[in-house]
Amino acid sequence: MSNDRPMEPSIASAAQLAKLLRATGYLADDALATIGFLALRLGRPLLLEGEPGTGKTALAEALAEALDLPLIRLQCYEGIDASQALYDWDFPRQILHLRALETTARIGEGGDGADGPDVEKSLFDERFLLARPILRALRESPAVLLVDEVDRADDEFEAFLLEVLSTYQVTIPELGTIRATVPPIVILTSNRTRELHDALKRRCLYHWIDHPGLARELEIVRSRAPEVGERLSRQVVSAVQAMRRGDDLVKPPGVAETLDWARALMELGASDLDVEHASATLGVAVKYREDADRVRASLDTILGA
């Protein structure tokens, strides 16, 4: 049974959400603000896909800050399974506890430490439970749960996620069923290294995030790196936009690289992005040797864009 619920009416419109996000330094366009607002109002997970560096993870961070909620992050990777997302038992502490019970039983000639069922019950007490991100999000809600790079996980983990997101509850055999009093706000991100299953997509609202255009990216730099001069900011953003227009880079720079590049140039005292400064700091913007070689070979064209 679905546990969807509309969010409390604290955010009345997409425009209000965009304003709250802007106050954290995150500039959402109208489409993203609208789908984010609908996800909050309808109580549905939001799946964000896009190239690396387009601000998918940053949206979850900004949303948690804007709503004054804890951010709980589940970083997906190849081979992740349900136990690594849900919970585990603190085995070393359980062993110490068991030894303490045995010692108590010997000294007291019986007592609680000698009772088998009681021993087992005490071993699987909540004090020995290691809550992983999903269980934490269910127990600590309201919270923002970020399931980052879900495309790196496998089909089995996707099926597990779908079940959790359908019920917002998990069952721990030794403790029973744990339900979220208020379901967490769930943001899933994917770099689309593989296609996600339709069942998971149907469960979520969906939005593709593109790299920002020149005007919006310049606005982001002004907001996030106000210490960088206007002229240098424009030159950096123009250069990054030119790099992205080509289709020959392994990984075009994202917004994070734009910000880092602008700040790095400022630290070097550069007031203009010329060929010398660009070549010396290229490793801030591009992270593959072949990309650096291609960009360096065409810097005159890129800087003149």
Positions of PLM-derived features:
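C-terminal regulatory/interaction module of P-loop NTP-utilizing enzymes
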Residues: M1-A305
